[in-house]
Amino acid sequence: ERLAELGIPLKHIDIGGGLGVRYKDETPPSVADYANAMRPALEKLGLKVYMEPGRSISANAGALLTKVDLLKPTNHRNFAIIDAAMNDLIRPALYEAWMDIQSVNPKHDVEVKTWDLVGAICETGDFLGKERDLALQENDVLAVLGAGAYGFVMSSNYNTRGRAAEVMVNGDQAYLIRERETIESLWERERLLPEE
């Protein structure tokens, strides 16, 4: 209304990425609930409303698979060192985002313990999950769910780590759509200084 008073006409309003994603125990609003909550304020303006549903569509379309390399129980905390790290999925370190982490092949004969799932980058922020109750053994494969939104695009080569491969699953078929980066591929554009 203030913009209209200033002679700045609007044709639409973009409310951004409003729809949330269920990571833990949240209940994000449905599209209808979201629209109904905004309708009283926006309807009288007569504007088209645009929304960017990106994360609500893509987050649960992707999972990061990681292997348990080493179990390191201590008197204070139990650490599961995994082969994924903060360079593969930065959201937990950057935003303290809670990611649902599940065993791909759950073990029913292994004791459930509380674990911190940490990478091998040796940074205090290198974790994908803290205080997770899981029955773990070395070489177990874990799925970090909800990693489809911004997972790969925010990944990096920190500590000269190649980014993970990407696999697209369509029905019962899996297709490699991006190969895992290798040390050689990371170095291929680097050059040494000429010898004198």
Residue spans for each PLM region:
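Flexible, glycine/charged-enriched surface loops at secondary-structure junctions
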Residues: 6-12, 48-53
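Short, solvent-exposed loop/turn segments at secondary-structure boundaries
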Residues: 24-29
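Charged (often Lys/Glu-rich) extended helix/loop segments that serve as interaction or gating elements
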Residues: 37, 46-196
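Solvent-exposed, well-ordered amphipathic alpha-helical segments
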Residues: 1-4, 10-15, 114
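Glycine-rich beta-strand-to-loop/alpha-helix junction loops that act as flexible
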Residues: 13-22, 53-55
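Alpha-helix-loop-beta-strand connector modules within alpha/beta enzyme cores
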Residues: 2-6, 34-46
